[in-house]
Every structure is written in structure tokens, then in C-alpha cells.
UniProtKB/Swiss-Prot annotation:
The protein's name in its UniProt record: Imidazole glycerol phosphate synthase subunit HisH
Pfam families in the cross-refs: GATase
Record-linked CDD domains: GATase1_IGP_Synthase
Pathway where it operates: Amino-acid biosynthesis; L-histidine biosynthesis; L-histidine from 5-phospho-alpha-D-ribose 1-diphosphate: step 5/9
Major subcellular site: cytoplasm
Active-site residues, Swiss-Prot/TrEMBL: 172, 174
Glutamine amidotransferase type-1 domain sequence ranges: 3-192
Subcellular locations according to the entry: Cytoplasm
GO molecular function: glutaminase activity; imidazoleglycerol-phosphate synthase activity; lyase activity
Gene assigned in the entry: hisH
Role, per record: IGPS catalyzes the conversion of PRFAR and glutamine to IGP, AICAR and glutamate. The HisH subunit catalyzes the hydrolysis of glutamine to glutamate and ammonia as part of the synthesis of IGP and AICAR. The resulting ammonia molecule is channeled to the active site of HisF.
Known catalytic reactions: 5-[(5-phospho-1-deoxy-D-ribulos-1-ylimino)methylamino]-1-(5-phospho-beta-D-ribosyl)imidazole-4-carboxamide + L-glutamine = D-erythro-1-(imidazol-4-yl)glycerol 3-phosphate + 5-amino-1-(5-phospho-beta-D-ribosyl)imidazole-4-carboxamide + L-glutamate + H(+); L-glutamine + H2O = L-glutamate + NH4(+)
Assembly mode: Heterodimer of HisH and HisF.
Organism of provenance: Azospirillum brasilense
EC number: 4.3.2.10, 3.5.1.2
Length: 192
């Protein structure tokens, strides 16, 4: 049985992402133990690691020196001041500023994914799949080839980024119903 470590960095409720991982594993008939942990040794030993999308860039980075999700893969961010990221994917996290001033921030709701390139975690997603977003900042990715899918909210933004064995989503897979569960199942069965 493989282990998926869901990192608990003390910044939010992890029940929803843990349940999504369990449902996706059952749906793809994969044998995974979901371990919610803040123990660095357990994370190192895990077969897969998930950084849930709860909390803010600066709070989580400063509080634990662990990464809360896609945005911390960036070189830096500007949420709650300038914060250094991990630099795994070139780019910066900046305020979401839609061209249409009537659009509200934070962006909360369903958006269509525009798949830019093939990737195993998006395999089998239906064309124009929708995902659920809640965010006020976006990852301004420097290299277009690192954007796997985008969405639009008064202008395009990176919805899924990835390189090598790393993938991050701006949306909440655990709240994105069929699309999210398919992505999580693909992640669990993905072989690099």
C-alpha cells in the first residue's frame, strides 16, 4: 500500500482534501493510505505528497517553512507583503486584477479550464471541464511551457502548472466535483 502525505501546516481544515483523496483512490481502485501529518520524516517517506490549498502564501511559508500549494512553487509572492517562494517554477504570485472592474475579488466560483498541453493528471478530463476557484492572487508564470491549463476571470491566469514531477492547481480539486476527483485519481496513478 502506498502512502499519500497530506501536509498539515496548521492553516485550515484538511477533512475535505483528505476525503477527496480517499474517494479518488477508491474510484481508481488504487491502494493508498492517506496520512494527514506535519511530521517531516513521514512526508519524506511518503510515496506522494499533497500540499492542500488552504491558508495564505505568507502565513504558511513563515509559520512552518512548508509549502501550502501551487503558489509556493513560485519564486516569490506579494500576498501580505513580499515573501520568498521555493522557486520550483519560475514566476511570481501577484494580485488578481481583472480587466472588468465589476468582477469581484476574491474570485469565487466555477470556471472553465483551457487545457494548454497534455499532462497525465488531466488525462480523460472532458473538453471544457469546470473547476471551483477561490482566490485573490494568481501565479504569473514566467515560462509558458509550465502552464498546463488556464482559466479566465477578466483575463487569463494559470489554473494548473507543472514541470517534471511537480503539479499544482489554483483551483480546489476537493470542491471541483467530477473534474477534481478525476484529477486527484490521475495524480494517484501517475508514474513519472
Amino acid at each position: 500500500m502506498e502512502t499519500v502525505a497530506l501536509i498539515d501546516y496548521g492553516s485550515g481544515n484538511l477533512r475535505s482534501p483528505a476525503k477527496a483523496l480517499e474517494r479518488a483512490a477508491a474510484g481508481c481502485h488504487a491502494s493508498f493510505q492517506v496520512l494527514v501529518t506535519s511530521d517531516a520524516d513521514a512526508v519524506r517517506k511518503a510515496d506522494r505528497v499533497v500540499l492542500p490549498a488552504v491558508g495564505a502564501f505568507a502565513d504558511c511559508k513563515r509559520g512552518l517553512s512548508e509549502v501550502p500549494g501551487m503558489q509556493l512553487m513560485a519564486e516569490g509572492g506579494r500576498e501580505y507583503g513580499v515573501t520568498e517562494g521555493l522557486g520550483w517554477i519560475k514566476g511570481e504570485v501577484v494580485k488578481l486584477e481583472p480587466a472588468d472592474p465589476t468582477l469581484k475579488i476574491p474570485h469565487m466560483g466555477w470556471n472553465e479550464l483551457d487545457i494548454r498541453r497534455e499532462h497525465p493528471v488531466l488525462a480523460g478530463l472532458r473538453e471544457r471541464a469546470h473547476a471551483y476557484f477561490v482566490h485573490s492572487y494568481r501565479f504569473a508564470v514566467e515560462r509558458p511551457e509550465d502552464v498546463i491549463a488556464s482559466a479566465d476571470y477578466g483575463g487569463p491566469f494559470a489554473a494548473v502548472v507543472g514541470r517534471d514531477n511537480l503539479v499544482g492547481t489554483q483551483f480546489h480539486p476537493e470542491k471541483s466535483q467530477e473534474t477534481g476527483l478525476a484529477l486527484v485519481a490521475n495524480f494517484l496513478t501517475w508514474r513519472v
